[in-house]
Amino acid sequence: MRHLPNLICLFRLALIWPVAATLAAGQYALSLGLFVLAAVSDGLDGYLAKRFNWTSELGKFLDPMADKFLLMTLFVESAWLGLVPWWITAAAVARDVMIGLGALVFRLWFGPLHGRPAVISKINTAAQLLYLAGVMFSAAVGFPPREVLDAFALVTFVTIVLSGYHYLATFTRRVWSTPAQPSS
């Protein structure tokens, strides 16, 4: 049972292709259902890992990667299909690339990067998930109207920028306060 959160996370990774394929095929209701299943699995694996202390190094890596792959895939595809604006897609992808590269550089130069996701990062992930679910719901049933989605896109954009800024500031502080490790 200890590895159940990792299995759920792998299940979420496996759902990315069917969500993307059904979205591309215009099967918006099915795509939304699969996407909601993926989003619920994100909450479930985190809950189980914390509640039963089933955390692992693999899970600490796999969970955020699954989130990033799911969200980046769907943002890019949704923009390509004309369902979301490119500007929010560019912001979401740029934020995730910046965080990924920042973490990689920190690890290579300074060693392991310890810490927990910031509250603003969790809010951002929730906003992105809700925004994309709203976009798919709108594509499936014609509601909510475009103006509501545009307003939520702005709210989501603000969380992307605030979260990106928070990570940039955090990485910068850690870089200045951590001595570089000698190269081997």
Over which residues does each language-model region extend?
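Alpha-helical transmembrane bundles and membrane-interface segments of multipass inner-membrane proteins
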Residues: 1-184
